[in-house]
Design a protein with these regions (language model features):
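Alpha-helix capping/helix-boundary segments
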Residues: 47-48, 73-75, 92, 137, ...
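Core dinuclear metal-dependent hydrolase active-site scaffold
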Residues: 1-36, 87-142, 154-159, 205-213
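Active-site metal-binding motif and surrounding structural segment of the metallo-beta-lactamase
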Residues: 27-70, 144-147
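A short helix->loop->beta-strand "cap" motif at the edges of active sites that frequently abuts
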Residues: 62-66, 167-171, 198-200
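Short internal beta-strands
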Residues: 64-73, 171-178
Length: 213
């Protein structure tokens, strides 16, 4: 399976010629095109940097085979589209094209006590790649590649260290890094990796670049 990183939290997985898009947010200008070409779009939660409602709606209109999965708030904003848009929650599992997906988690990490928490789910794809959305979700199953959030109003370096240790992946890739400069990304990778307090390498993957996972 091939993983291509796009801006911030958006990733595309490719297997056997089919693609799956996770979190096409407004920081990803090519999100509508990526979603239109995919067999499925997975959304972790409703925040704009993870879910560009206009882009996903346009993709649904352009590709009548596209399916979208996410928390109930995603269905509320998009509509059901004859069942192609459906809500998922922790414990769900489904297959779409060559992708097997398991769903974990319930809530977005706390940003501040004055801000209500919302639903957030994480996705494990083909038993290999885990996208936690905006939470330090520990799936409790083996993970080959962890997509590791490294910046944002809810993140904590101390919690991130403990998170990587708890998940214990073979490899990690930085996501949710739009608030960091290049130097900040390098610092996060070093601190969260084996040269710092983390157990595994944390890769910086520039937007548009791909790796095999």
């Amino acid at each position: 399976m091939e993983l291509t990183k796009y801006n911030h939290a958006t990733v595309v997985l490719e297997q056997d010629g089919a693609t799956l898009v996770i979190d096409p947010g407004t920081f990803t200008p090519e999100g509508a095109d990526l979603a239109t070409a995919a067999v499925a779009v997975l959304v972790t939660h409703e925040h704009f940097d993870h879910f560009d409602v206009d882009a996903v709606r346009a993709a649904l209109d352009a590709n009548d085979a596209l399916v979208v999965r996410g928390p109930a708030a995603i269905v509320d904003q998009l509509g059901a589209h004859d069942g192609r848009v459906a809500a998922v929650s922790a414990g769900d599992a489904f297959e779409v094209g060559p992708f097997s997906v398991q769903v974990f988690g319930e809530e977005h990490a706390v940003i501040h006590g004055d801000i209500p928490t919302i639903a957030n789910v994480g996705y494990l794809v083909n038993g290999a790649v885990f996208h936690p959305g905006d939470a330090y979700l520990v799936p409790g199953v083996p993970v080959r590649t962890l997509l590791l959030p490294t910046s944002g109003p809810w993140t904590s370096t101390a919690e991130a260290v403990d998170y990587v240790r708890a998940v214990s992946p073979e490899h990690a890739v930085q996501i949710h890094e739009a608030m960091l400069s290049e130097l900040g990304q390098q610092s996060a990778a070093r601190f969260l990796g084996p040269d710092g307090l983390g157990p595994v390498p944390v890769q910086i993957l520039p937007a548009g670049e791909s790796i095999t996972v």
